Amino acid sequence: MSSGNETVLIGKVSATHGVRGQLRITPFSGDVDSLLTLRSIMVKKPGGEMEIFAVAASKAHGKKVIITLKAFDNINQVLHLVGRELYALREQLPELPEDEYYWCDLLGLQVVTEEGESLGELVDIIVTGSNDVYVVQGSGREILIPALADVVLDVDSDAKRMTVSLPEGLLDL
C-alpha cells in the first residue's frame, strides 16, 4: 500500500447543484459512501497545481454525491470548478470492499488474457449506466473491456497486472 500522503483521484465535478454553491460529484470508485466522510478535497487547477477546500457537508444523490464547500455559498463562485478532477489524500479514504478499486489503482495496469496474451495498458475508464468499461491501449489499437466480474478475473496490484477472460469475438470488433 502507498503512503498516506498520496493523492488519489476520487471523482469529477459534473455540475453545480442548486444556487447555493453546491457541487454534483461523479465518484470514480463506484462507492458513493466513500466520499461522504471527507473533510477536505483537492481540485486540480488547469496548470496542474492542487487547491485544497474544506468540505462543509456532503450527501448521496443517487450514484452521485452533492458536496458543499465551506468557501462558497453561491453558484457563481463554483462554476469554474465544473469539469475539474477531484482528489483526496489516500489516508482519508476508506478501504474499499474486496474486488473494488480506486481508479488510480487500475490506470496503468498491464492487461493480459487468462492465456497470458498481453492486450496492453489500461489507459482510461468509461462510466456507463450499468458497468464501467476499461479502455486498453496496445498493439496499435484500442480495446474496450467491460468491467464485469466474469470478465475481470484478477487484479494484482503488486505485479501491476489485470487478468481478463474476454467475451467471445471481442477482439474481432
From Swiss-Prot:
Keywords: Chaperone, Cytoplasm, Ribosome biogenesis, rRNA processing. NCBIfam families: 16S_RimM (TIGR02273). Residues 98-170 form the PRC barrel domain. The keyword Glycoprotein does not apply. GO terms for molecular function: ribosome binding. The PRC barrel domain binds ribosomal protein uS19. This is Ribosome maturation factor RimM. The lineage of its organism: Bacteria, Pseudomonadati, Thermodesulfobacteriota, Desulfuromonadia, Geobacterales. Its main location: cytoplasm. GO terms for biological process: ribosomal small subunit biogenesis; rRNA processing. An accessory protein needed during the final step in the assembly of 30S ribosomal subunit, possibly for assembly of the head region. Essential for efficient processing of 16S rRNA. May be needed both before and after RbfA during the maturation of 16S rRNA. It has affinity for free ribosomal 30S subunits but not for 70S ribosomes. SUPFAM superfamilies: PRC-barrel domain, Translation proteins. It holds the Pfam family RimM. Binds ribosomal protein uS19. It is found in: Cytoplasm. The keyword ATP-binding does not apply. InterPro entries: PRC_barrel-like_sf (IPR011033), PRC_RimM (IPR056792), RimM (IPR011961), RimM_N (IPR002676), RimM_N_sf (IPR036976), Transl_B-barrel_sf (IPR009000). Disulfide bonds: none annotated. One of its GO terms (cellular component) is cytoplasm. Belongs to the RimM family.
